[in-house]
Every structure is written in structure tokens, then in C-alpha cells.
């Protein structure tokens, strides 16, 4: 497995971890604040994750950053979040990572970093 394939595998694993977390949360938890952290509510965190996935995936496809946008209009509704997480996972997996340029690889690493940073914030739920 080359580096590009490893990067895609790590993105897939990070995406699955996010999905699994949301799957196991009660919908009421989406309105909770993260303890001892000046941050968005969990729904806001998930909106940011989805927006980053959509925006970075588009940037990877286009070979350059095209700005941030998020289609998740209802981040407090668990089913909507799960469906959108599934859609962004599918979209990422449609990209052939073997032929990526250095710029595209950097964008993919930025997406991975963003997802993992949110994991670091969301794990505070478990305290």
C-alpha cells in the first residue's frame, strides 16, 4: 500500500469513527455543550465536520481550495447528520487517490487533520 492509499485508508477510518460516535449518541446530545471547552455545541461541531468534508472533497477534486460550504441544514437531527456523513464518505471514496497531485494530497491531509481535531474535542463528551 502506497502513501496515497494509506492516506485514503486513514480518512476512511476517521470518517467511520465520526459516524460511529453520532450513531451512538442520543439525538438530545446534539444540543449539548462540550464541557470545559469554549466551543460550539455538538451539533455545531458536526456541521463543521460535514462542511469541511464537502469543501475539502471539492477542493481535492478541483485541485485547489474553492471555499467553505455546508449542505447540512439540520445538524440537530441525528438522521440528517448520519445521512450527510454517509454521503460525504461515499463522495470521498469516489476519488482515485492514486493520481493525486501534491496540492491534492496536501488538501486531503488537511481534511484528515480537521476531522481528527474534532475527534479531540468530541472525546470530551466521554468524561
Where in this protein do the model-derived segments appear?
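Short, contiguous alpha-helical
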Residues: 8-12, 16-19, 30-68, 101-127
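Active-site rim elements
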Residues: 3-8, 75-78
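A structural signal for long alpha-helical coiled-coils and helix-turn connectors
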Residues: 26, 33, 93-96, 126
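Acidic catalytic patch
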Residues: 28, 86-101
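His/Met- and acidic-residue-enriched segments that coordinate or traffic transition-metal cofactors
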Residues: 2, 19-29
